[in-house]
Amino acid sequence: MSVLLIPATQRTPELAFDPDAGHLRIAGESFPEDVNAFFDGPMGRVNEWLDESQGPVLLDFQMIYLNSSSAKVFVKLLVRLDAQAALGRDCRVRWWHDAEDFNIRELGEEFRDRVDHLRFELCEVVAGDTHS
């Protein structure tokens, strides 16, 4: 399976998926006009990879803003990863948030509270730091 890179737009996040590394990054703003049209293809590839692979998974969220439709897509992904983690797979989520962005931090806390087995880290971005 090849690397997937969908650049961010004004309404959609960047999606970067490297199946060999087991790394998915979702970054930016997410309020697409048609959430299914935007996410179905990429999430289908991720789900296919989850079915075919047993390797570790790292999911980095670097969100600036997301609407409720995008949040539902993310919850479905987190539930799927949580089920994989319950079976013993190494699954980890890093939810990056700016130190001043309490709304995004709070949303990350809500997502974290929905999973039982998944390692879910809230990661504060410090000015000048870079991460991937």
Report residues per predicted region.
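A cross-taxonomic marker for long C-terminal extensions/tails that follow the last structured domain
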Residues: S2, I6, R105, E109-S132
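STAS-typified acidic loop motif
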Residues: V3-D40
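Structural motif
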Residues: H23, P56-L58
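Short, well-structured hydrophobic secondary-structure segments
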Residues: F31-P56, N67
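Surface-exposed, flexible loop/turn segments at secondary-structure boundaries
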Residues: P32, D101, G128
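Amphipathic alpha-helical interaction surfaces in cytosolic regulatory modules
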Residues: P42, L58-R112
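Secondary-structure boundary motif
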Residues: E48-E52, A83-L87, D113, H117
